[in-house]
Amino acid sequence: MTRTAHWLWRLALCAAVLAAACLLSASARGQDAGEKVYKAKCTTCHGADGAGATPVGKATKARDFCSEEVKKESDEEWTQIVVKGKNKMPAYDKKLTEAEIKDVVAYIRGLCKK
């Protein structure tokens, strides 16, 4: 290979590494944003671990995010519950942006993996 070809390969490798780092960074930002929304809007009922075992959660029968039944639901189903509300959970369509809803759904999914 010529020197030019080596430099092109190195440049391509650097670009790929930078692109991967940017994607990971965006994912981490979304996770941080989701955690912030969750702590502000969800922990009163669902608790820090998502089990719904808080006094308010028990009184309102908040769902345990890590239960097998809930884990089977799609992100779209969870998004609709956040947007429209369900049972005693209020709707958040006027309180959260689409990005915040997406971030909090991703954060909730991560709770069960910890």
What positions do the PLM features span?
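Helix-centric, low-specificity signal for extended rod-like, repetitive segments
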Residues: R3, D32-G34, T79, K102
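Electrostatic cytochrome c docking/interface patches
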Residues: C22-V37, A53, E68
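Generic hydrophobic secondary-structure packing signal
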Residues: A26, G30, H46, W78-I81
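Periplasmic/extracellular electron-transfer cofactor-ligation site
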Residues: E35-K61, K84-K88, G110-K114
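Extracytoplasmic electron-transfer domains, predominantly the class I c-type cytochrome c fold
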Residues: A59-L111
